[in-house]
Amino acid sequence: MDGRQDGPFPFIRSIGTACLAACMLAGAKTPAHTQAGAKMIAMETMKVGSAPADFDFARTGQGGASQWVVVDDATAASKLAIEQSSTDRTDNRFPLAIYQPVTAKNVEVAIRFKPVAGKVDQAGGIAVRVTSPNDYYLVRANALEDNVRFYRIVKGRREQLATANVKVASGEWHSLGLKAENDRFTVVFNGKTLHSTSDRALPGPGRVALWTKSDSVTRFDQISIRILP
């Protein structure tokens, strides 16, 4: 297995060229399917046992490096999934898989995720406006806590802005969506809008990322990204 671990963060240097990224996926290396104005990352083109193409990897907080790898999954839409497989139990450890072809301020992201294992946490989420491993907005769901929460992370400090108690079953696929439009952030879980929150702490453009926590082994598929005006 040659899934890449956390490394340098070249995406930080390129955030200043966000205006060029308005074309976002036009030059993406990994093919993407267009669905109703959104770009769906083509999981079927990825190689099992390798790190997912077009992602860089980082970590907020402490603990060991993350491990992101493409795995077979018969229950995934394309029979493949992106998995964070490291089981480091450090509580303040938040692995990120940052999608490089996209830089945007206003964006709508939808994913499916499946909590597979974890004794400290079984969490999966979406980060937007990522300008560094320590600065972004986040929605995450946790199967051990049965809740979905929205956070802002500024200079590595995580602050909860909204929460909802809902059933998040382990071993099952769930849909999760985050719409960031100016200072308004709307969270959708399994087709239901849970909360809508206003915040202005991070007003500029940034990357989109997949997120996990601590020892969560979590799988992701059906990742779609739509740039908003």
What does each model-found stretch correspond to?
Residues A38, P203-P229:
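Ligand-recognition surfaces built from glycine- and aromatic
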Residues M43, V109-I111, E172-V187:
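Short tryptophan-centered beta-strand motifs in secreted/extracellular beta-sheet-rich domains
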Residues H33-G61:
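Extracellular carbohydrate-recognition regions
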Residues S50-I82, T90-N92:
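Extracellular glycan-recognition surfaces and repeat-rich motifs
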Residues V154-S175:
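Short, aromatic/His-centered strand-loop micro-motif at the edge of beta-sheets
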Residues D2-C19:
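Bacterial N-terminal signal peptides that target proteins for export
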Residues V48, Q84-R149:
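Secretory/extracellular carbohydrate-interaction modules
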Residues V188-R207:
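Short, solvent-exposed beta-strand-to-loop segments that form ligand-recognition rims
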